[in-house]
């Protein structure tokens, strides 16, 4: 299976995925990275791995569908004539909602990772929301993207404890450990993970 990474983050999970490819425990092939800024850590990881990179800047107030059409063109470029049905879009810290147009084109082919046990605490600042709610457990969710905000079909959820003295940083570290372990596993078995 082929996948393209969409990331606008430091790339912690992306780096873990690349390490699993390097040690051959993940046999899926990464065709490249799409990011919105050159200075993100994910771009550094892609560059070090020798992967093609496409930077698609996002301007404040830009129409979602117009931006998604640029993303779509970059995806097709990275696919180099491969059939769209042989490729998954793996969002790893992608901080933009997709338009209904984009979701309809890539239906059931867009994976996302979220740092909470959805449907609890969707959207940004999940760790802070978990702590504010005084939850005793948190975790991560890998799900398909649909038209909503973190509402798509859940593929995998893994839990971890939340301790009374946790901070956003300590909880984030614990959840990221789960994310780094499980995203490569889902990429290895997808699409059978949802059948």
Role assignments for model-derived ranges:
Residues 20, 49, 86, 90-195:
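Donor/substrate-binding cores of folate-linked one-carbon enzymes
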Residues 29-31, 52-57, 109-114:
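Short hydrophobic/aromatic-enriched beta-strand-loop microsegments
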Residues 40-61:
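Conserved nucleotide-sugar phosphate-binding/catalytic loop shared by glycosyltransferases and other
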Residues 1-4, 15, 31, 69, ...:
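Membrane-interface segments of envelope glycosyltransferases acting on lipid-linked substrates or membrane lipids
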Residues 21-25, 79, 134:
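Active-site catalytic pocket residues across diverse enzymes, especially alpha/beta-hydrolases
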Residues 59-82, 88-96:
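Short phosphate-binding loop-to-helix
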Residues 1-44:
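N-terminal beta1-alpha1 ligand-phosphate binding loop
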């Amino acid at each position: 299976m082929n996948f393209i990474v969409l990331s606008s983050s430091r790339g912690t999970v992306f780096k873990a995925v690349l390490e699993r490819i390097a040690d051959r425990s993940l046999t899926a092939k990464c065709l490249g990275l799409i990011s919105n800024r050159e200075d993100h850590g994910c771009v550094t990881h892609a560059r070090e791995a020798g992967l093609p990179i496409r930077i698609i800047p996002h301007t404040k107030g830009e129409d979602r569908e117009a931006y998604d059409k640029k993303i779509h063109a970059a995806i097709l470029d990275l696919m180099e004539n491969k059939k769209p049905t042989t490729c998954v879009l793996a969002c790893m810290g992608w901080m933009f909602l997709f338009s209904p147009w984009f979701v309809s084109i890539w239906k059931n082919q867009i994976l996302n990772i979220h740092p909470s046990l959805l449907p609890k605490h969707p959207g940004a600042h999940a760790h802070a929301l978990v702590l504010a709610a005084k939850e005793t457990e948190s975790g991560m969710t890998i799900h398909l993207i649909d038209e909503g905000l973190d509402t798509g079909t859940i593929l995998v959820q893994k839990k971890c404890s939340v301790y009374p003295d946790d901070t956003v940083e300590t909880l984030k570290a614990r959840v990221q450990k789960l994310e780094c372990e499980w995203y490569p596993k889902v990429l290895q078995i997808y699409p059978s993970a949802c059948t």
